[in-house]
């Protein structure tokens, strides 16, 4: 059993046994019903990527390709356009969060990255002083929230630090997320930001180090408990999945493509489970 599978099962069981029930919930199911959830707060996990510990479960298939394409839309294209997401990456699930028939998700995610020129600033800071302690990407922009409607960012902050081990430099990353649907999105979000960590590391020719993941509200929606029980029953496969970025060290951040990523040794338990999403 992988470390990710151990953490996944432990968190599911903890939510079932110890979780609190949501009140005044905002999300809705497609039929209009309020999407309540059971949740825990303050969930934390640590993965040593350098030792092959990657935050992806083998208990069900995780759609990593579309997740990485979404990441590129946010941090390379720096876009909030649904047309760009569909035409360039053939990703459609963000249509559920279109704002007022604008074909955008409002001033969120990529729009905030572009507004503050965040990626260029982080690359410059790391180039000038890899050991600086100010490498913070934050998507939490109150001014943008007031400017337009839109889903507030779930995974909203990632920080980077560099460590020297012998002759090698390792890039660590810490992801903070305000809210996470553990059964559907937990490993999608984690692997997205591992991919981002790898892109920064490749840009500088560094090795990937540790990945820290903090979720403030980790929940299971009230229409997902059958799937949760099924996941607890499943026996994980023996393989150790690994995400690889197949470009030379020193490849510019903006020259990396989604197809440069390869998920190796991934043979998840099937069949896939169906989830009715809360919007």
UniProtKB/Swiss-Prot annotation:
A cellular component annotation (GO) from this entry: cytosol
Classification via InterPro entries = Thymidate_synth/dCMP_Mease (IPR045097), Thymidate_synth/dCMP_Mease_dom (IPR023451), Thymidate_synth/dCMP_Mease_sf (IPR036926), Thymidylate_synthase (IPR000398), Thymidylate_synthase_AS (IPR020940)
Q: Where in the cell is it found?
A: Cytoplasm
Q: Which pathway does this chain act in?
A: Pyrimidine metabolism; dTTP biosynthesis
Enzyme class of the recorded protein, top EC level: transferase
Primary subcellular site in the record, as a coarse category: cytoplasm
Catalyzed reactions per annotation: dUMP + (6R)-5,10-methylene-5,6,7,8-tetrahydrofolate = 7,8-dihydrofolate + dTMP
Query: Which Gene Ontology terms cover its molecular function?
Result: thymidylate synthase activity
Q: Which SUPFAM superfamilies match?
A: Thymidylate synthase/dCMP hydroxymethylase
Q: In its keyword annotation, does this UniProt entry include Hydrolase?
A: no
- State the function annotated in the UniProt record: Catalyzes the reductive methylation of 2'-deoxyuridine-5'-monophosphate (dUMP) to 2'-deoxythymidine-5'-monophosphate (dTMP) while utilizing 5,10-methylenetetrahydrofolate (mTHF) as the methyl donor and reductant in the reaction, yielding dihydrofolate (DHF) as a by-product. This enzymatic reaction provides an intracellular de novo source of dTMP, an essential precursor for DNA biosynthesis.
Q: How does it assemble?
A: Homodimer.
**What's the protein name?**
Thymidylate synthase
The organism's taxonomic lineage, starting at the top: Bacteria, Bacillati, Bacillota, Bacilli, Lactobacillales
Q: Which gene carries the instructions for this protein? A: thyA
């Amino acid at each position: 059993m992988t470390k990710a599978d151990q953490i996944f099962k432990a968190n599911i069981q903890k939510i079932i046994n110890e979780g609190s029930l949501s009140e005044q919930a905002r999300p809705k199911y497609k039929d209009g019903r309020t999407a309540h959830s059971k949740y825990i707060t303050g969930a934390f996990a640590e993965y040593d990527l350098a030792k092959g510990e990657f935050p992806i479960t083998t208990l069900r298939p995780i759609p990593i390709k579309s997740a990485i394409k979404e990441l590129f839309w946010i941090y390379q294209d720096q876009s909030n356009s649904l047309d760009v997401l569909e035409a360039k990456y053939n990703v459609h699930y963000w249509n559920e969060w279109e704002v007022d028939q604008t074909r955008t998700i409002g001033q969120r995610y990529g729009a905030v990255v572009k507004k503050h020129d965040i990626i260029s600033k982080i690359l410059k800071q790391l180039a000038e002083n890899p050991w600086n302690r100010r490498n913070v990407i934050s998507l939490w922009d109150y001014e943008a929230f007031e400017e337009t409607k839109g889903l507030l960012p779930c995974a909203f902050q990632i920080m980077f630090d560099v460590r020297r081990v012998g002759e090698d430099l390792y890039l660590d990353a810490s992801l903070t997320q305000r809210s996470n649907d553990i059964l559907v999105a937990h490993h999608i979000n984690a692997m997205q930001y591992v991919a981002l960590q790898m892109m920064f590391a490749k840009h500088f020719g560094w090795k990937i180090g540790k990945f820290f993941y903090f979720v403030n509200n980790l929940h299971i929606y009230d229409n997902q408990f059958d799937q949760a029980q099924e996941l607890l029953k499943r026996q994980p496969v023996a393989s150790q999945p690994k995400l690889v970025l197949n470009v030379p060290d020193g490849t510019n951040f903006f020259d990396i493509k989604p197809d440069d990523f390869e998920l190796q040794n991934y043979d998840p338990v099937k069949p896939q489970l169906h989830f009715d999403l809360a919007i």
